[in-house]
């Protein structure tokens, strides 16, 4: 029976929950906002499957990539909307055009980060761009398995530990699965993210109401978030900032109507000035397992890994236009074929060049 006594030994991937046929494992949030599996001993048969699919207990060997590229999407608008080079999009589009399904992280209506799937080109946009919050996998491992069994191509994207969890959950190789992980700094607490959004809404409301007369306690302007980007490129890729778009609405009773004087507004902050990003980059509220990550150094089993190619200007200055350059690690023959089909603008590089200013490929994070 799976028992979590050391929280650094659970990455929250949901593999154990997903594999349990008796559904006696649930994910429950702790006081830091992270989900951990809890087993109902009264219904558990002690079959051991949950332990067999745990990527922390059953780690793969480290791997070096077959090929490494500096890459960028030829579509400037797609690259603008992406965190780095926009390489995820053509990979996903190719799968969908072949009748497949793409899984990735998106915002829900409350701006929580969840994993979901799409089989439309339009749906890919929701997965585009980094989300610096641990996403909830939910039932997506099982959904991916069903699509794979049907013979449909599946692209599953996520953090290295989520990809490792998926592969352990599947317990067999599928030729129609393309696993893509994003090189990860660590995943912040969803609870901290929710608190940040609550405090930001309150701050925006207070600033807006300053100096105004409140007619009624039931009639007030409330900021409604309409868009979030953790990596806005308004001032360039190397000076990415946090952007939050919002609009003010008047709420009276149960009715909500747009104020005629309201227009969408933007909060754009450099990372050092945004309290959430500052804490994230200082490693203050990452999941405990991130400080002891077992999925780095190519151990996730992904076919392709994607990251920012920081320092690309030192090697290929003519290729760097400060609009975003991706670091693409091709980890398998399947990944090589998939990447070649993207027709991306790319230069073959080396692992050492990519690693030079991207230590998260190998190094653990520590509290600053």
Predicted segments with their positions:
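Iron-sulfur-associated redox domains of electron-transfer enzymes in respiratory
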Residues: 55, 61-368
């Amino acid at each position: 029976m799976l028992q979590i006594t050391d929280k650094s030994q659970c990455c929250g991937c949901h593999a154990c929950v997903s594999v349990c046929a008796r559904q006696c494992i649930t994910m429950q949030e702790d006081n830091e906002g992270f989900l951990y599996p809890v087993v109902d001993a009264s219904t558990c048969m002690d079959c051991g499957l949950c332990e067999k699919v745990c990527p922390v207990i059953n780690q793969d060997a480290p791997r070096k990539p077959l090929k490494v590229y500096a890459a960028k999407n030829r579509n400037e608008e797609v690259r603008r909307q992406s965190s780095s080079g926009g390489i995820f999009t053509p990979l996903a589009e190719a799968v969908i055009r072949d009748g497949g399904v793409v899984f990735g992280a998106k915002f829900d209506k409350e701006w929580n980060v969840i994993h979901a799937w799409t089989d439309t080109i339009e749906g890919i946009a929701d997965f585009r761009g980094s989300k610096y919050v641990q996403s909830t996998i939910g039932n997506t491992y099982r959904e991916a398995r069903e699509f794979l069994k049907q013979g449909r191509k599946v692209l599953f994207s996520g953090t290295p530990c989520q990809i490792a969890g998926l592969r352990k959950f599947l317990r067999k190789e599928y030729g129609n699965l393309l696993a893509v992980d994003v090189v990860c700094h660590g995943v912040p607490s969803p609870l901290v993210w929710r608190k940040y959004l609550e405090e930001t809404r309150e701050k925006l409301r207070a600033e807006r109401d300053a100096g105004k007369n409140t007619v009624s306690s039931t009639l007030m302007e409330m900021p409604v978030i309409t868009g979030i980007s953790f990596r806005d490129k308004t001032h360039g890729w190397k000076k990415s900032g946090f952007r939050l778009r919002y609009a003010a609405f008047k709420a009276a009773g149960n009715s909500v109507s747009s104020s005629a004087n309201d227009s969408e507004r933007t909060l754009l902050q450099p990372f050092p000035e945004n309290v959430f990003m500052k804490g994230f980059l200082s490693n203050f509220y990452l999941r405990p397992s991130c400080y002891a990550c077992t999925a780095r150094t190519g151990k996730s089993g992904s076919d392709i890994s994607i990251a920012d190619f920081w320092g690309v200007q030192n090697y290929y200055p003519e290729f760097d236009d400060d609009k975003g350059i991706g670091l693409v690690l091709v980890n398998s023959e399947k990944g090589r074929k998939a990447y070649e089909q993207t027709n991306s603008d790319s230069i073959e590089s080396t692992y050492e060049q990519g690693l030079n200013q991207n230590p998260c490929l190998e190094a653990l994070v520590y509290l600053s």
